[in-house]
A protein has these predicted regions:
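Charged helix-capping and loop-helix junction motifs
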Residues: 201-209
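Short, flexible loop segments at boundaries between secondary-structure elements
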Residues: 34-35, 215-232, 309-311
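Short, basic, low-complexity termini and linkers enriched in Ser/Thr/Gly/Pro
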Residues: 270-285, 289-301, 333-336
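C-terminal functional extensions of proteins
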Residues: 232-272, 300-336
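Electropositive, gly/pro-rich neighborhoods at or near active sites that engage anionic ligands
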Residues: 32-166
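Short internal beta-strands
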Residues: 28-32, 218-225, 261-266
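Active-site glycine-rich loop that binds ribose-phosphate moieties when present
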Residues: 162-182
Length: 336
């Protein structure tokens, strides 16, 4: 079984690639819910929805979120009625949130609601929220404390962040199936999502990080940082706020106690080779990797590999997914 940890838009691209090459019953996707919010009285799970829409081939290719060819008549009317409208929901997208909210109010858990939505969309891949308990990502900024969506969407992540809080994380429990999936996995993949606000909430759920430390399967992360900057979104700025560099070394630090292999973009090969104190020279596009001494890493030295990680097409997604799984199948030390 292949287990993927992901946030929303960026990570869901790799999920689509894995979907092309892995049997659906052998793929489990564990998704961040720290971004969840109540909007117009509805429970919205942005990252789960991005994953579901991606797997169902419904995701808007132009926007990178929401449903393809959606209309926004309800949003227009809500704006006319004086309701908040900075968080855009399309009409078809609203149907998902209405359905989820109805199931939650009827007593179903978020896991159960997610499974039912996946079935209705014809998705056979197992999609799990990180927890059925509410965990909220809150950010202390120069303008006050904000929810993640207020920071990311309303403020366009342009305000300075001084601290990140994961409200409710300490009392949360992994959703049913999460720990079991980690224990049974043949490969564990961290998609190129924000290490602070996408992966951070997942890893803050008690029991998940410990399970990753104990995992017998190789743990591979695809870096969301290319050329010292985030491919999209505020990952770089948030990593610096955490005291991590906005580099491959910063990504490795975020996952240092369980990570075995870090996949970087080929654009970073030259920079890596010139900074041997951080990461040793590696061959672009080659599964034969050198090793980087990351303090307190799970293994004696982290294996770092370069390939193309920018996913613009279905072929790019498939190629990266194949590359990652081939790495997992390469025996430790085989590249020596």
């Amino acid at each position: 079984m292949i287990v993927v940890f992901t946030g929303g838009t960026g990570g869901s691209k790799l999920v689509q690639g894995l979907q092309q090459i892995v049997k659906p019953e052998e793929l489990t996707v564990i998704v961040n819910t720290g971004d969840d919010l109540e909007w117009w009285g509805l429970h919205v799970s942005p990252d789960i929805d991005s994953v579901l829409y991606s797997l169902a081939d419904l995701l808007s290719k132009d926007r990178g979120w929401g449903v393809e060819d959606d209309s926004f008549r309800c949003l227009e009317r809500m704006t006319q009625l004086g309701q908040p409208s900075w968080f855009s929901l399309g009409d078809l997208d609203l149907a998902t949130h209405l359905s989820r909210t109805a199931m939650l109010r009827a007593g179903k858990t978020l896991s159960e609601a997610t499974t039912e939505l996946a079935e209705k969309f014809g998705i056979r891949v197992r999609v799990l929220p990180m927890s059925d308990d509410r965990v909220s990502t809150l950010l202390d900024t120069a303008t006050g404390r904000l929810t993640f969506q207020e920071y990311f969407v309303r403020e366009r992540h342009q305000v300075e962040v001084r601290a990140v809080h994961l409200e409710g994380a300490e009392h949360s429990r992994p959703a049913p199936g999460v720990i079991e999936s980690i224990e049974r996995a043949e490969a564990i993949v961290f998609a190129p999502s924000n290490p602070v606000t996408s992966m951070g909430p997942i890893l803050a759920v008690p029991g998940i990080r410990d399970a990753l430390r104990r995992a017998t399967a190789p743990v591979v992360a695809v870096s969301p940082i290319v050329g010292g900057a985030a491919v999209s979104g505020p990952a770089g700025a948030l990593m610096k706020m955490m005291g991590w560099p906005s580099t491959l070394a910063g990504v490795a630090t975020a996952y240092k106690d369980f990570l075995d292999i870090l996949v970087a973009d080929g654009a970073d090969a030259q920079a890596i080779s010139s900074q041997q104190s951080a990461v040793s020279p590696i061959a672009s596009g080659d599964a034969s990797a050198s090793r980087s001494p990351i303090p307190d890493s799970r293994s004696a030295a982290l294996r770092v590999v370069c390939t193309n990680t920018i996913m613009r097409s279905a072929a790019d997604k498939r190629d990266l997914a194949e590359f990652v799984l081939n790495l997992c199948a390469t025996p430790q030390g085989a590249e020596a």
